């Protein structure tokens, strides 16, 4: 069965970038159609990414906190995990959010076409779905087709014991021994979940630190804590993977590589993602796609074809949902005739591990590469009353300031709920705040949040909660 429809805007992909673009288009009075390969809206993020991982991380955190409370005089029995019920909880979270999106699409009169969409011309798209073919004629298109996990040619990915992030989130079983390939955010988050559920975790990372994009001093605090849970093999890489009946045998080389191949019950490959740009027949619409699958856009998110836009993972790093959402808003507003641009000063990054690692703006490495003269100020949570009382005093808040203007240009937090504390720093950078602006803002006490203000006081030389290195000598 084949049908044909006409619309002002078609959005290819319904992840956070795609549905945000579609809903914004509808709110601006544009007739809008979403094409989505999943049966529900939300894309990778809501279905097999950000949201289910946070549901499982919540479970992991509760398990770990229950164990830790013994030191405070509250002793529980050994946690008993029911994997089926945990999986049901995860699915409940997903269904609540995807159901909400379906309701908002209906309320906005956004038509949803399920299936795989590919371009057949500059103004036509063909969707292959379970119910047949749908041809969509459009005036404008927004490509939000996302990304997928990287696969390596020497790894037998067809073996069910070789996982990507989607497989790990299915929570089919808890392996006795799990290897995480890649010390980035996805691998560490999944390692956190499976460690809490009982797995022995090895992490192999080719760089000299996990979370390579973050500053070393922040990662050092994190590594000290996480090393008690994971066996970290830094400056090491996997060279061979062999699937046998009794397990997956992995050969490694490098600084921490074992001498012999190691047997694992499962291997999670979490070494990054690649864009889906080559899967759309975008060339038939005249849209240029580079060798890696990325689509180049300008600050209004236009491709080289003026009426076709691209947003989200498919336009480049960082591959983060919140970046894609803002890109989606801009693309919709430009189509509606507004002179808007995507030109953020900062895009925050967060590893939702325990402790969390979060940063925004420039890192020290980036400031050095740009030739910026900078100064850092840190506030250790060991001096925070709230952190000590909440048993999370191993955290740290760090601000990076331009040495001449004293404006904040970057910041990072490592500690419990660190990501929740990052917003003030991001806003300060966007608004051009300097150290004095932050230091003179009264922060509630006792909170973890006040560590941002106290770090600014360290820079200003007005700190009284720590020895003051800038105090006048007597």
Curated annotation (Swiss-Prot):
<feature type="binding site">
    <location>
        <begin position="36"/>
        <end position="45"/>
    </location>
    <ligand>
        <name>FAD</name>
    </ligand>
</feature>
<dbReference type="GO" id="GO:0005829">
    <property type="term" value="C:cytosol"/>
</dbReference>
<dbReference type="InterPro" id="IPR001100">
    <property type="entry name" value="Pyr_nuc-diS_OxRdtase"/>
</dbReference>
<dbReference type="Pfam" id="PF02852">
    <property type="entry name" value="Pyr_redox_dim"/>
</dbReference>
<feature type="binding site">
    <location>
        <position position="238"/>
    </location>
    <ligand>
        <name>NAD(+)</name>
    </ligand>
</feature>
<dbReference type="GO" id="GO:0042867">
    <property type="term" value="P:pyruvate catabolic process"/>
</dbReference>
<keyword id="KW-0520">NAD</keyword>
<feature type="disulfide bond" description="Redox-active">
    <location>
        <begin position="45"/>
        <end position="50"/>
    </location>
</feature>
<dbReference type="GO" id="GO:0006103">
    <property type="term" value="P:2-oxoglutarate metabolic process"/>
</dbReference>
<dbReference type="GO" id="GO:0016020">
    <property type="term" value="C:membrane"/>
</dbReference>
<dbReference type="InterPro" id="IPR023753">
    <property type="entry name" value="FAD/NAD-binding_dom"/>
</dbReference>
<keyword id="KW-1003">Cell membrane</keyword>
<dbReference type="GO" id="GO:0045254">
    <property type="term" value="C:pyruvate dehydrogenase complex"/>
</dbReference>
<keyword id="KW-0285">Flavoprotein</keyword>
<feature type="active site" description="Proton acceptor">
    <location>
        <position position="445"/>
    </location>
</feature>
<feature type="binding site">
    <location>
        <position position="321"/>
    </location>
    <ligand>
        <name>FAD</name>
    </ligand>
</feature>
<dbReference type="GO" id="GO:0006979">
    <property type="term" value="P:response to oxidative stress"/>
</dbReference>
<comment type="similarity">
    <text>Belongs to the class-I pyridine nucleotide-disulfide oxidoreductase family.</text>
</comment>
<dbReference type="GO" id="GO:0050660">
    <property type="term" value="F:flavin adenine dinucleotide binding"/>
</dbReference>
<protein>
    <recommendedName>
        <fullName>Dihydrolipoyl dehydrogenase</fullName>
        <ecNumber>1.8.1.4</ecNumber>
    </recommendedName>
</protein>
<feature type="binding site">
    <location>
        <position position="313"/>
    </location>
    <ligand>
        <name>FAD</name>
    </ligand>
</feature>
<dbReference type="InterPro" id="IPR016156">
    <property type="entry name" value="FAD/NAD-linked_Rdtase_dimer_sf"/>
</dbReference>
<keyword id="KW-0007">Acetylation</keyword>
<dbReference type="GO" id="GO:0006090">
    <property type="term" value="P:pyruvate metabolic process"/>
</dbReference>
<feature type="modified residue" description="N6-acetyllysine">
    <location>
        <position position="220"/>
    </location>
</feature>
<feature type="binding site">
    <location>
        <position position="205"/>
    </location>
    <ligand>
        <name>NAD(+)</name>
    </ligand>
</feature>
<dbReference type="InterPro" id="IPR050151">
    <property type="entry name" value="Class-I_Pyr_Nuc-Dis_Oxidored"/>
</dbReference>
<dbReference type="GO" id="GO:0005886">
    <property type="term" value="C:plasma membrane"/>
</dbReference>
<keyword id="KW-0997">Cell inner membrane</keyword>
<dbReference type="InterPro" id="IPR036188">
    <property type="entry name" value="FAD/NAD-bd_sf"/>
</dbReference>
<dbReference type="GO" id="GO:0005960">
    <property type="term" value="C:glycine cleavage complex"/>
</dbReference>
<dbReference type="GO" id="GO:0008270">
    <property type="term" value="F:zinc ion binding"/>
</dbReference>
<dbReference type="InterPro" id="IPR006258">
    <property type="entry name" value="Lipoamide_DH"/>
</dbReference>
<dbReference type="GO" id="GO:0004148">
    <property type="term" value="F:dihydrolipoyl dehydrogenase (NADH) activity"/>
</dbReference>
<comment type="function">
    <text>Lipoamide dehydrogenase is a component of the glycine cleavage system as well as of the alpha-ketoacid dehydrogenase complexes.</text>
</comment>
<dbReference type="InterPro" id="IPR012999">
    <property type="entry name" value="Pyr_OxRdtase_I_AS"/>
</dbReference>
<dbReference type="GO" id="GO:0006099">
    <property type="term" value="P:tricarboxylic acid cycle"/>
</dbReference>
<comment type="subunit">
    <text>Homodimer.</text>
</comment>
<feature type="binding site">
    <location>
        <position position="117"/>
    </location>
    <ligand>
        <name>FAD</name>
    </ligand>
</feature>
<dbReference type="GO" id="GO:0045252">
    <property type="term" value="C:oxoglutarate dehydrogenase complex"/>
</dbReference>
<dbReference type="GO" id="GO:0015036">
    <property type="term" value="F:disulfide oxidoreductase activity"/>
</dbReference>
<dbReference type="GO" id="GO:0005737">
    <property type="term" value="C:cytoplasm"/>
</dbReference>
């Amino acid at each position: 069965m084949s049908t044909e429809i006409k619309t002002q805007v078609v959005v290819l992909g319904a992840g956070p970038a795609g549905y945000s673009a579609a809903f914004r288009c509808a709110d601006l009075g544009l007739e809008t159609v979403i094409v989505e390969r999943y049966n529900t809206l939300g894309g990778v993020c809501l279905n097999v990414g950000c949201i289910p991982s946070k549901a499982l991380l919540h479970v992991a955190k509760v398990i770990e906190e229950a164990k830790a409370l013994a030191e405070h005089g509250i002793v529980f029995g050994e946690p008993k995990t029911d994997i089926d019920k945990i999986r049901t909880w995860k699915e409940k979270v997903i269904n609540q959010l995807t159901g909400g999106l379906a309701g908002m699409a209906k309320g906005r009169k956004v038509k949803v076409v399920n299936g795989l969409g590919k371009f057949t011309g500059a103004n036509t798209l063909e969707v292959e779905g379970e119910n047949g073919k749908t041809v969509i004629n459009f005036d404008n298109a927004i490509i939000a087709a996302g990304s997928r996990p990287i696969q390596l040619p020497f790894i037998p990915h067809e073996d069910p014991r070789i996982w990507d992030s989607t497989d790990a989130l299915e929570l089919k079983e808890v392996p006795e021994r799990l290897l995480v390939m890649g010390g980035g955010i996805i691998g560490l988050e999944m390692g956190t979940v499976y460690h809490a559920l009982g797995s022995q975790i090895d992490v192999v990372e080719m760089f000299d630190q996990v979370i390579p994009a973050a500053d070393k001093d922040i990662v050092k605090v994190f590594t000290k804590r996480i090393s008690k849970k994971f066996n970290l093999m830094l400056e090491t890489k996997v060279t061979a993977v062999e699937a046998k009946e009794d397990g997956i045998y992995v050969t490694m080389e490098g600084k921490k590589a074992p001498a012999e191949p190691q047997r694992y019950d499962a291997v999670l490959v979490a070494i990054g993602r690649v864009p889906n740009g080559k899967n759309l027949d975008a060339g038939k619409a005249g849209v240029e796609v580079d060798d890696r699958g990325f689509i180049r856009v300008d600050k209004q998110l236009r491709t080289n074809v003026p009426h076709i836009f691209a947003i989200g993972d498919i336009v480049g790093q960082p591959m983060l949902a919140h970046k894609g959402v803002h890109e989606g808003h801009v693309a919709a507003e430009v189509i509606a005739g507004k002179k808007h641009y995507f030109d953020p000063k900062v895009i925050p990054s967060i590893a939702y591990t325990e402790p969390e690692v979060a940063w925004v703006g420039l890192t020290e490495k980036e400031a050095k590469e740009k030739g910026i003269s900078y100064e850092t100020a840190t506030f250790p949570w060991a001096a925070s009353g709230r952190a000590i009382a909440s048993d999370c005093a191993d955290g740290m808040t760090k601000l990076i300031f331009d040495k001449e203007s004293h404006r904040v240009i970057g910041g990072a937090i490592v500690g419990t709920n660190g990501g929740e504390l990052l917003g003030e720093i991001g806003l300060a950078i966007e608004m051009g705040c300097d150290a004095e602006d932050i230091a003179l803002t009264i922060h509630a006490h006792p909170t973890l949040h006040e560590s941002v203000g106290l770090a600014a006081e360290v820079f200003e030389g007005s700190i009284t909660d720590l020895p003051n290195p800038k105090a006048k000598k007597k």
